[in-house]
């Protein structure tokens, strides 16, 4: 940049302007404002972070933007100053441009090098592709960075370097043989997975260095990477997602699982799960080794634990993109801190095994696939933290089968965050075809934004719109600015009640674009269609007044009052929501939290939420506190992420949080009122809206709800990351069955079996108190008797299914076989299908399937020391919702129309009535013609 602004500032300080009268200064200032040389660029709503300014970015900046100092001077003085400084500015500009042009040959993606090699021998081009592939592991498309990374690998271990280079070469050649996209090959996108495969196969080999036979599996595994990459990109293209290092993870996991530690030809390093609590003395922690962990964590992306190798890799990143280097270091620090929060052994932290996944996640979110703003910078930190705990969970789970975690944690967590949908303008995801490196990504975003702002709003000429804008500015008294709405402001008239669905599905968009062929007004009746009965009664009263009696009229009036009173507390309590829209945000937020508490059971009713919270306090006040905190944090996070306001108001971003808080308290081995437990409750509850948004983006392709999948993912990751032997947050020890249960059928107690019905309903919230289950049944009945009925039926089905496979009686009495069947029976029996006798039978079948699936998953997950949670319900209900049939009695509702079973059936009957009327009209018109 030119140094002219600094010189101008110094001149002003040395010779201050003479004092002038206030009137003359006002006229001069007014003339400056009307001058055509006044900067007319609009302000950026996303202020640029301090970036390395590239030559192409300098071209975007106007000369007036170089200085933020406004100097008031006369026009003749301005012209003289410009004439005298024009040669000096031109020479300084040429010098600065030549410097940046020289730097641009080495930084960024070195596009000039790629263009120069186009007409050179293929050997040189192939070498460029291999070097770019080595650097693409860290999202860097720069051959110089790749060369430096190879130097760092040689410092670590020359044998590993040979294996990694062979993997890159073979993977790139396989992509050429398969005729993959040439531009992707030239960018190294088909080489980086082979690089990692070669390196990690050598790292995990139990043989000594230079075991040349190992190059055979390296060759074959690397050749599979382009095939897997092409297949995954075909699937991920539907959501415009990258494949990351998934091909490497698949190939490496298959190789290590196929060989193992006891293979004669290719033995691998033995990986075993933790079997005892680690011995940690906090006074023995060494700060120099902790600081050394930062470059070591970066080096562990390539499987290297040498701090000098990590430092060399950081230099390679800085050459291409300082922002990538910065976020890599930040990600390594976040992983280090996350490891300390769960009392990880110091040796594991020092080797950087907690950091490398965080490095990749922080780089990917912090400016690579999202435009870098302060919002996405914070999002990158959250993603790195989530990735650290996910990595710990996957490491413990995969250690059971003797396989290392690879970079699965990075892939799964980053893909989840890339699927996030938000209305926040500061979170902008780039199209995959426009992704280069963070600095260029931000320049592209600012350029596109500036061009959009300069476009005339009504399609007129640019000068006309500019002139119109000046006239509007002059007529300031007549300008009306839109009133800003609070984050708590909800247009209740536009809310469509939905259950377990987030965002706007494709089906809903089609309905808004293509209206139905018949008119439909959403019925305002509640439950048993009492208002329709009243209207018919009024007609009879008007037509047959002479035959009515005073008793009948009084009964009708009483029925009206009862119906109106019931409508205030049953169903969705829409009147409560509409009455709160102009009240304090605190009352609105309380309504959302209560609705979120009841949405676990598909109920959108704050009164039911109050009863459920009361039942939780009857069970255990500590559990109730933890669950309420989870609901609050999950709802607040959804507000911060600018999720759909109607979904937040319906409690659809709170129910996963309440389950997370409850089950973390239930499975804690520290007992009640262990207040430190609230910290992981807060963290894991905050991830629920992110997981919900990501899953809804995927499931919207099939118009499916996300159910309690976010809760299942969050709790499973937490329990797997901590485990029974964790010092800070130990969980209950779960072990698989190793002996045949001793069951005597004469010992079965029928009263306890009957009590298992309400207990099974209470176990949806992790409660085994029958009184709590009874209160939950009352809460369900208040909102919808049909939901209450199917909940009881589902719990009964689960109990009978458990008896049919000789489940130990204690498990049946505690309701552990009934809660998944309860949720599945409600979901199919009138919630997402219209209630008919066919769907009623389908709900019973789904409940039975969920019970047996629950037993299967309980046995499988117990091997990893994990509970089944509500995985069986989610998998079975989603399976039955994907069912297609020509049976007219099985009608699946669009997600945008789902409310509660009684209203769902009223909607369906009104649609059928209108459809039949339209068919009769068409038939009559055809008959007349």
From Swiss-Prot:
The chain crosses the membrane at residues 133-155, 162-179, 184-204, 212-232, 241-261, 310-330, 349-371, 378-399, 400-420, 609-629, 647-667, 675-695, 704-724, 773-793, 812-832, 841-861, 863-883. Residues 1-89, 451-480 are annotated as: Disordered. Residues 1-11, 55-88 have a biased composition (Basic and acidic residues). Belongs to the urea transporter family. GO terms for biological process: urea transmembrane transport; urea transport. Pfam families: UT. Keywords: Cell membrane, Glycoprotein, Membrane, Phosphoprotein, Transmembrane, Transmembrane helix, Transport. GO terms for molecular function: cell adhesion molecule binding; urea transmembrane transporter activity. This is Urea transporter 2. Residues 31-42 have a biased composition (Low complexity). InterPro entries: Ammonium/urea_transptr, Urea_transporter. GO terms for cellular component: apical plasma membrane; basolateral plasma membrane; plasma membrane. Residues 458-470 have a biased composition (Gly residues). The modification Phosphoserine is found at residue 486. It comes from Rattus norvegicus. Glycans are attached at residue 742.
């Amino acid at each position: 940049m030119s140094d002219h602004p600094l010189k101008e500032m110094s001149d002003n300080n040395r010779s201050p302007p003479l004092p002038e009268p206030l009137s003359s200064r006002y006229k001069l200032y007014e003339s400056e404002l009307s001058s055509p040389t006044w900067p007319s660029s609009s302000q950026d709503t996303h202020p640029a972070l301090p970036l390395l300014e590239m030559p192409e970015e300098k071209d975007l900046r106007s000369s007036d933007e170089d200085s933020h100092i406004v100097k008031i001077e006369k026009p003749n003085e301005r012209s003289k100053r410009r004439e005298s400084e024009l040669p000096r500015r031109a020479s300084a500009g040429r010098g600065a441009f030549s410097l940046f042009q020289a730097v641009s040959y080495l930084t960024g993606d070195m596009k000039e090098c790629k263009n120069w090699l186009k007409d050179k021998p293929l050997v040189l081009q192939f070498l460029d592709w291999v070097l770019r592939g080595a650097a693409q592991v860290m999202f860097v498309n720069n051959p110089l960075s790749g060369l430096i990374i190879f130097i760092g690998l040689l410092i670590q271990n020359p044998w590993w370097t040979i294996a990694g280079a062979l993997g890159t070469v073979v993977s790139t050649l396989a992509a050429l043989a398969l005729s993959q996209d040439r531009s992707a090959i030239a960018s190294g996108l088909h080489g980086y997975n082979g690089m990692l495969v070669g390196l990690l196969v050598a790292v995990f080999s139990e043989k000594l260095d230079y075991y040349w036979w190992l190059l055979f599996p390296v060759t074959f595994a690397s050749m599979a990477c382009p095939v897997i990459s092409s297949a995954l990109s075909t699937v991920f293209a539907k959501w415009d997602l990258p494949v990351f290092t998934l091909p490497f993870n698949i190939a490496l996991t298959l190789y290590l699982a196929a060989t193992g530690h006891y293979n004669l030809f290719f033995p691998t390093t033995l990986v075993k799960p933790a079997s005892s609590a680690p011995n940690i003395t906090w006074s023995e922690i060494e700060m120099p080794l902790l600081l050394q962990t930062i470059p070591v964590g970066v080096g562990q992306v390539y499987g290297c634990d040498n701090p000098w190798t990590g430092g060399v890799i950081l230099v390679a990143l800085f050459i291409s993109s300082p922002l990538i280097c910065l976020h890599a270091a930040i990600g390594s620090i976040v992983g280090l801190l996350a490891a300390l929060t769960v009392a990880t052994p110091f040796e594991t932290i020092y080797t950087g095994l907690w950091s490398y996944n965080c490095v990749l996640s922080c780089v990917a979110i912090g400016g690579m696939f999202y435009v870098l703003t302060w919002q996405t910078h914070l999002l990158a930190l959250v993603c790195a933290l989530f990735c650290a705990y996910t990595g710990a969970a996957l490491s413990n789970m995969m250690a059971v089968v003797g396989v290392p975690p690879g970079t699965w944690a990075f892939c799964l967590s980053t893909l989840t965050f890339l699927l996030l949908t938000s209305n926040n303008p500061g979170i902008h995801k780039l199209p995959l075809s426009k992704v280069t490196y963070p600095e260029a990504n931000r320049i592209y975003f600012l350029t596109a934004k500036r061009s959009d702002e300069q476009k005339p709003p009504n399609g007129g000429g640019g000068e006309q719109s500019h002139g119109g804008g000046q006239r509007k500015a002059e007529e300031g008294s007549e300008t009306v600015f839109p009133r800003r709405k609070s984050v708590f402001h909800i247009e209740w008239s536009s809310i469509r009640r939905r259950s377990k669905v987030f965002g706007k599905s494709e089906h809903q968009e089609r309905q808004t674009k293509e209206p139905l062929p018949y008119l439909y007004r959403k019925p305002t009746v509640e439950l048993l269609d009492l208002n329709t009965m009243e209207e018919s009664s009024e007609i009879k009263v008007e037509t047959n007044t002479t035959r009515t009696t005073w008793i009948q009229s009084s009964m009708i009036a009483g029925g009206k009052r009862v119906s109106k009173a019931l409508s205030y507390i049953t169903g969705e309590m829409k009147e409560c929501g509409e009455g709160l829209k102009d009240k304090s945000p605190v009352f609105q937020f309380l309504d959302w939290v209560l609705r979120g508490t009841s949405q676990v059971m598909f109920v959108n009713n704050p009164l039911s939420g109050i009863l459920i919270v009361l039942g939780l306090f009857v069970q255990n006040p500590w559990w109730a506190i933890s669950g309420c905190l989870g609901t609050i944090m999950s709802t607040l996070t959804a507000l911060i992420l600018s999720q759909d306001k109607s979904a937040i108001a319906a409690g659809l971003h709170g129910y996963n949080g309440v389950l997370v808080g409850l089950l973390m308290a239930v499975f804690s081995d520290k007992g009640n009122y262990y207040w430190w437990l609230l910290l992981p409750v807060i963290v894991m509850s905050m991830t629920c809206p992110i997981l919900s948004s990501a899953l809804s983006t995927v499931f919207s392709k099939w118009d499916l709800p996300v159910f309690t999948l976010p809760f299942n993912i969050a709790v499973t990751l937490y329990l797997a990351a901590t485990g029974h032997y964790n010092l800070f947050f130990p969980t209950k020890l779960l072990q698989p069955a190793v002996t045949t249960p001793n069951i005597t059928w004469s010992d079965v107690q029928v009263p306890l079996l009957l009590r298992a019905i309400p207990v099974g309903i209470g176990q949806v919230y992790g409660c085994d108190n029958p009184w709590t289950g009874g209160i939950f049944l009352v809460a369900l009945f208040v909102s919808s008797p049909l939901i209450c009925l199917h909940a009881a039926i589902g719990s009964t089905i689960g109990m009978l299914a458990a008896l049919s496979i000789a489940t130990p009686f204690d498990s049946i009495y505690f309701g552990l076989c009934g809660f998944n069947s309860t949720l599945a029976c409600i979901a199919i029996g009138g919630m997402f299908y219209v209630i008919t006798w066919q769907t009623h039978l389908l709900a019973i079948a789904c409940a039975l399937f969920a019970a047996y699936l629950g037993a299967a998953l309980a046995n499988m997950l117990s091997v990893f020391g994990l509970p089944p949670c509500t995985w069986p319900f989610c998998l079975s209900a989603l399976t039955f919702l994907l069912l297609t049939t020509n049976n007219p009695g099985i009608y699946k509702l669009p997600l945008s129309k789902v409310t509660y079973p009684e209203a769902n059936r009223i909607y369906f009957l009104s649609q059928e009535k209108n459809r039949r009327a339209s068919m009769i009209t068409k038939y009559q018109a055809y008959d007349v013609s």
